[in-house]
Amino acid sequence: MEDVQNSPAQVAMPIDRVGVKNLKLPLVVRDRAQGSQHTVATVDIGVDLPAEFKGTHMSRFVEALENWSEELDYNSMKRLLEDVKERLHARKAYALFRFPYFVRKGAPATASSGLVWYECRLTGELGDGKPSFLLELEVPVMTVCPCSKAISDEGAHSQRAVVRMSIRMTGFSWMEEFIDLAEAAGSSPVYTLLKREDEKFVTEDAFAHPTFVEDVVRAAAQRLEGHPHVAWFRVEVESFESIHCHNAFASIEREVRKG
């Protein structure tokens, strides 16, 4: 049969990235509490395309993922990228896995147990040299406004905020390490299951630890700078203001120099 993809391109221009998007895939990831957990990923995967070729071979991306059934980590992602490069005769390969990561969390007063989910993204790129990886996490927290607390006779406005972290690492770290440091930066973590005793505890504890988005982003950045395996990070905190019709945000980006 005629191989149209390998025919000459009408416009001889190289393509930076071409492939498939939004492919659903069952996935196993490492879990600090249980060793591993099963989740579902949405995958984007692609390669570069030289100027002389009309198109890529889309089916080969799906074949690569169908033949890949490993636990997701940096080493297995590297093997997947190498396989894609070889199948497509490409110089560069790229993959993005988006998935919910679940942590079972006990409520602070009653220890009632519930699963909290965190949106995660792992991106890998491989060219001629070493692969590069980027881990992204979204961690919800609660914040209480210090200004509102200072000027109000009763109470203060509070809201949910999200800590978004993008991290490049030099070694293995548990996802929970970054979840923990983000939650510690806010006024309080958030929970799935809370009884009345828990709600009382969370409300009073958060009120005792008021934080601006500026406080949260600085606290998270300080902890990321001190992490032994973090080489670069970007952290953004977005607060979904309860008494305003807009959101507040703050962000910090740093390259971490060790030693």
UniProtKB/Swiss-Prot annotation:
GO biological process terms on file: tetrahydrofolate biosynthetic process
Recorded metabolic or biological pathway in which this protein acts: Cofactor biosynthesis; 7,8-dihydroneopterin triphosphate biosynthesis; 7,8-dihydroneopterin triphosphate from GTP: step 1/1
Enzyme Commission no: 3.5.4.16
Statement: the UniProt record of this protein carries the keyword Hydrolase: yes
Positions of the record's site feature: May be catalytically important: C145
Swiss-Prot/TrEMBL catalytic activity: GTP + H2O = 7,8-dihydroneopterin 3'-triphosphate + formate + H(+)
GO molecular-function term, one example from the UniProt record: GTP cyclohydrolase I activity
Pfam families cross-referenced by the UniProt entry: GCHY-1 (PF02649)
Key words, A-Z: Hydrolase
Family, per entry: Belongs to the GTP cyclohydrolase IV family.
Known role: Converts GTP to 7,8-dihydroneopterin triphosphate.
NCBIfam families per the UniProt record, alphabetical: PRK13674.1-1 (NF010200)
Name used for this protein in its record: GTP cyclohydrolase FolE2
Encoding gene (name): folE2
